[in-house]
């Protein structure tokens, strides 16, 4: 397929937008609470006391749970972006060059995602779930590692990168099958390498993305999209409702490995605070919720959760 002149002329605009903009959705940063520069840090021992006093936890996880699997996280200890902005929904659906660029980079990044295995954090949460300590496990990650570790009741808030959906007919298919077709259609691209990101993207630049061949849906010929929630796209209402229902029955909220900078996850901190439920965070560095936390453990999440599960006899 030939790209239109508008698509070709959009290349410089796309590069500028991707390098300059910070990802925001309609939800992002809404109703943000102040984030103080200093916050008293608690210890992993305090986490044990927190879990003992609140035996049924709603657990919300973020990228920090998967860094030990070789999947990078989004932000540094100050909550700032480590890499260029992730794909924006409106850009993906509205610009063919942007879609080609996304799938080219995703084809490279998929290698890291598909080979990742669960970390000690994932395994500790399986133990806690088996011991009846988790009311619901909610993850902002798209890597599927909680299920791979053996967790049974998981809400993938932002979807799963191992699934592809058609924006025309809604058909869902396995990403592995698409990966094989992308490699067959673009054999020379398969030889390239670049650093992967937490969303399955890769830092691939300075390529002629207009030449990357992306297949259409085999059912209706529609546009294919990874089955994940892009920035600027809404989390499905039924997922939010399921989390809120579980939070209502939980004793407290535990956040593991997330800075909570994106509102899709932070909203549940707001819900917990409004309901008078305590909130604990295990995360290295600053979080958006620091001003309202009951407990803040600035510690490696895998080490902290593994120790917690062991001390609880899980």
Regions found by a protein language model. Name each.
Residues 2-314:
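Conserved catalytic core of sirtuin-type NAD+-dependent deacylases
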């Amino acid at each position: 397929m030939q790209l239109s002149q508008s698509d070709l002329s959009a290349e410089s605009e796309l590069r500028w937008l991707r390098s300059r903009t910070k990802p925001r959705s309609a939800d992002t940063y809404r109703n943000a609470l102040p984030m103080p520069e200093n916050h008293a840090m608690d210890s992993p021992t305090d986490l044990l006391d927190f879990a003992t006093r609140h035996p049924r936890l709603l657990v919300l996880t973020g990228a920090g749970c998967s860094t030990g699997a070789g999947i990078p996280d989004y932000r540094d200890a100050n909550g700032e972006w480590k890499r260029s902005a992730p794909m924006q929904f409106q850009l993906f659906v509205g610009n063919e060059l942007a879609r080609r660029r996304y799938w080219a980079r995703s084809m490279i990044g998929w290698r890291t995602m598909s080979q990742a295995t669960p970390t000690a954090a994932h395994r500790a949460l399986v133990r806690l779930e088996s011991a009846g300590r988790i009311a619901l496990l909610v993850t902002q990650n798209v890597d599927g590692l909680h299920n791979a570790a053996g967790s049974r009741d998981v809400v993938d808030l932002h979807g799963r990168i191992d699934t592809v959906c058609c924006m025309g007919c809604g058909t869902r298919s396995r990403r592995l099958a698409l990966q094989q077709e992308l490699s067959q259609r673009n054999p020379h691209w398969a030889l390239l390498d670049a650093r992967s990101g937490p969303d399955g993207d890769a830092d691939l630049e300075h390529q002629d993305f207009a030449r990357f061949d992306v297949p259409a849906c085999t059912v209706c010929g529609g546009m294919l999209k990874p089955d994940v929630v892009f920035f600027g796209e809404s989390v499905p209402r039924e997922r939010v409702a399921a989390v809120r229902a579980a939070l209502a029955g939980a004793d407290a909220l535990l956040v593991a490995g997330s800075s909570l900078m994106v509102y899709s996850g932070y909203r549940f901190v707001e819900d917990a605070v409004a309901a008078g439920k305590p909130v604990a965070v295990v995360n290295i560095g600053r979080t958006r919720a620091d001003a309202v936390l009951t407990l803040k453990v600035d510690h490696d999440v895998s080490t902290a959760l593994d120790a917690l599960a062991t001390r609880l006899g899980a």
